[in-house]
Structure formats: structure tokens, C-alpha cells
Amino acid sequence: INVPDLLIASHIIPWADSTAEQRLAPENGICLSALYDKAFDRGLITISPDDYTITLSSALLEYETKDYFDKHFGSIARNKIIMPIEHAPNRDYLAYHKERIFKGV
């Protein structure tokens, strides 16, 4: 999305679960639209710590037949995220999200 007002700096490890250092670490953040921020926070999508690809949860796949699914979620499944020039998302933090927050495949 190219509309800065619709982008959110999202924590990979949630604020409540983070140490003081993690809360301020740029590597504990990713830039997402409001829709994907909510999906990420709720564990409906995750980012692989191995190759930075997006995985959809089975809970989200229940909506695969809905009109909006392909446009908003099917189109991002298995895509690699656009990496920032500096402060790439920390692989350990992404692993935490995948293991503890993501609702699984």
C-alpha cells in the first residue's frame, strides 16, 4: 500500500510479551497496513523466519470462498515480504510469532 496514513509499525513480539529492549528494537517491527497488522496480531498470518514468506493460518483459510479472500489474502500467500534497507525483522522474533501467536496451518 502506498498510503503512509494506512501503514502501522507492528510489533513482531507483542508489546506485552516483549522485554524493554525488544520493545524499542527496530528488528521487532514490521510495517503493515491496518488489515494485515490486525491479521498478524491475531495470528491469522505469520512470516517465516527462514525465508520471510507469508503463511496464512487454517483459521483464515475457512474464508477462502469469500469474494474478498483472493484480493486481500490469497494474493499474499507464500509471497516474500519486501525487506527494509536497514533493520531486517529478527528471525528469532519471527520464530516466536510463528510458534506462540500464529494459529497454524
Where are the regions a protein language model picked out?
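Internal active-site segments that recognize and position negatively charged phosphoryl groups
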Residues: 1
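A detector for short metal-coordination/catalytic motifs
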Residues: 4-7, 12-105
